[in-house]
Amino acid sequence: MSSAKMIGRAVASCRLSSKGLRSQSVDLSILLSRNTYPNTRTMASKAITMDNINPNIVKLEYAVRGPLVTRAGEIEKELQKGADKPFKKVIKANIGDAHAMGQQPITFIRQVLSCVANPEIIEKGNFPDDVKQRAKDILKACGGGSVGAYTVSYGIEMIRRHVAEYIQKRDGFPSDWNNVVLVGGASNGIKNCLQLLVNKINGKSSAVMIPIPQYPLYSASLAEYGLELVGYYLDEERQWGLSTEELERSYAGGQEKNNVRAIVVINPGNPTGQVLTRENIESIVKFAHAHNLFIFADEVYQDNVYAEGSKFFSFKKVMMEMGEPYNKMELASFMSVSKGYMGECGLRGGWMELVNLDPQVQANLFKAISAMLCPSSLGQSAVDCVAKPPAPGEPSYDLWIKEKTQVLDSLNKRAKMIAETFNQMEGFKCNIVQGAMYAFPQITLPPKAIEAAKKAGKAPDVFYAFQLLENTGICIVPGTGFGQKPGTYHFRTTILPQPALLQEMLDIFRTFHEKFTKQYS
């Protein structure tokens, strides 16, 4: 096969499906078969082989887009070809992609994006005056008046200033726009900061404390950079809260072989859906101060708080209100347009605020960021709409607040629905979804199912998830991909399917679980 044909087939497998969703799977058999290489060179003569590839890339795993998702994509293609299955569609409850699950875009954001992408329509289109002005302001800040131009590597200054104003209004403490960096999604900002820690000290590797269960971005990034992961367990019996005792246990164990240098906190939680109390945050801050740890505050779900009595507190706000010495601690906080009420995952927009970094360290971080050129201008434009939304009295305000409220109210109802339904099912235990976009139920599996999983070479929760997918078309993420206490089994499901589809999914889930339990009893 010619190289052109091989590349063509690989690209074809990634084209948009009839539903407009990009498949996550590439036909690897094309690339791995020894009979399809474009020349007669043997494997031994390849410049890059599995013997000399970066071992950190081999170790890297990302469960949210792992084998189950690949299989789900294959099943979708099989259904499109008329395959006979006991279901007609795949329900992707595995990933926090709101728009893919039917959430409608926020009008103000999309109108501004339309105008900056095609300036000719600003005056020709029937847009509100505040949309027109915002688009003009963004374009004025772009080189050549076009979002097609590179921006400053750290983001457009005007938008960084708006983010700083947003943070200051949220927390009640000053925010310097020079410490705000616009990023291509919060994930990029997190990875940029993690790179600062890649250094052996006195012969010991650097390590980062990560909550267990955790969002797989962290374990994947630590593996990629050769950093060590030190897990601290969240307490499922206490609504996925945490204790100082557990933090100290984790730190002491990690410090024996490594240099523990940072702690990651995800609030509201992914995959666990908890919202930390102010007391919890204060305890973490005091712990981090006692051990001189850098804090990664992953706060991308700060708008997603549902449970009565729950409230989001930013780490920066709590640190500042605690006063000295805590208000001098080093912190990086992260926000994204992918979550919240916006759900603009594909635009890849977000920001990070750097607090109390050593000026020389921050200069070197900015140097590293410069090598990546700049985040997407459209993503930055979406950030501007989030950081500075329409104000009361402006033409777009009434529709904006209506749409925002509808999205968050609907998510609130779905959060309650999913927890209540799982708790009514035998063998399930699900904590209240206080915030974020996920439930993380614990499931009791029959001993025979656990034995069948072992024979199949799979973890029990992975075995269960594959059975669920093959029999119902529902795609979830096994708890194994996030980490869990030994002897317990969980899975993560999003609350993002629209209400009717979510109810359908839960009904199918109930029927499947009853059959599964009966089969392996």
Q: Model regions: which residues?
A:
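N-terminal mitochondrial targeting presequence
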Residues: 1-48
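Conserved core of the PLP fold type I
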Residues: 115-292, 296, 302-325, 332-333, ...
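N-terminal "arm"/small-domain region of PLP-dependent enzymes with the aminotransferase-like
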Residues: 32, 40-154, 165, 169, ...
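Conserved core segment of the aminotransferase class I/II
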Residues: 6, 46-50, 130-137, 224, ...
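Generic structural signal for small/hydrophobic residues in well-ordered secondary structure
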Residues: 68, 93, 163, 180, ...
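PLP-dependent enzyme catalytic core of the Aspartate aminotransferase-like
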Residues: 2-10, 24, 119-120, 124, ...
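Short beta-strand
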Residues: 83-84, 90-92, 429-434, 521
